[in-house]
């Protein structure tokens, strides 16, 4: 962001809440969210691939030790919560936790750092830097969090049908909680709402927490003079580290719980 182009706190806040977009309306794509989420996913894969490739049976390095501790923690969590048998759940849980954590961590970067760099590039390309929009926290974009939740929802449906069969899955939707044919419409509504509420709440919970955290940083930067911002930024950043980690953990745990519920025979 070019500071000289933004004259009021309202314009500053509005500018920082605007995505770099392609298209308009419903079909618009938030390019910044897509870029950072994909880039951080690639970063996760590169780091873990290098650690796995260089893993030794001797004294491990600091990075290998950290990765092994993380893998052990996630594996133990999955064993406690997922009672079925699947070799994919633990890797999925690890991927979700690390990926969401990395995307959340973008909220700890100085609020003007990446927007100002992008504004400089935008200006060099001959465009007005006042229109160089950029948001760096993918999980503060509801499209990203709901897309991830949709992926979890598809996996829940897959495991439900795989473990119970299509007939068993349909029976679960139509014959619970009232086990009588006359209550099929009511059962279908109740079970349908319960099923759909899982991905919606999963995505909105992560989005709401990260959007609120990002907004607080923006408000501090937009409303306070620069010399006093650190008085609020530092304590909030320290507290926000807990939120960042906790939200990644909650997203992972709920994913495992939903898949465990889908895998259980009723």
UniProtKB/Swiss-Prot annotation:
Keyword Transport (UniProt): yes
Source taxon at top rank: Bacteria
GO biological-process terms attached to the record: proton motive force-driven plasma membrane ATP synthesis
Localization per record: Cell inner membrane
Main location: membrane
Any one cellular-component term (Gene Ontology): proton-transporting ATP synthase complex
GO molecular function ontology, one term from the record: proton-transporting ATP synthase activity, rotational mechanism
Membrane topology, as annotated: Multi-pass membrane protein
Keywords, alphabetical: ATP synthesis, Cell inner membrane, Cell membrane, CF(0), Hydrogen ion transport, Ion transport, Membrane, Transmembrane, Transmembrane helix, Transport
Membrane-spanning intervals of the chain: 28-48, 88-108, 141-161, 206-226, 237-257
Quaternary structure, from the entry: F-type ATPases have 2 components, CF(1) - the catalytic core - and CF(0) - the membrane proton channel. CF(1) has five subunits: alpha(3), beta(3), gamma(1), delta(1), epsilon(1). CF(0) has three main subunits: a(1), b(2) and c(9-12). The alpha and beta chains form an alternating ring which encloses part of the gamma chain. CF(1) is attached to CF(0) by a central stalk formed by the gamma and epsilon chains, while a peripheral stalk is formed by the delta and b chains.
Role summary: Key component of the proton channel; it plays a direct role in the translocation of protons across the membrane.
HAMAP family named among the record's database cross-references: ATP_synth_a_bact (MF_01393)
Protein name: ATP synthase subunit a
Organism: Pectobacterium atrosepticum (strain SCRI 1043 / ATCC BAA-672) (Erwinia carotovora subsp. atroseptica)
Gene that encodes the chain: atpB
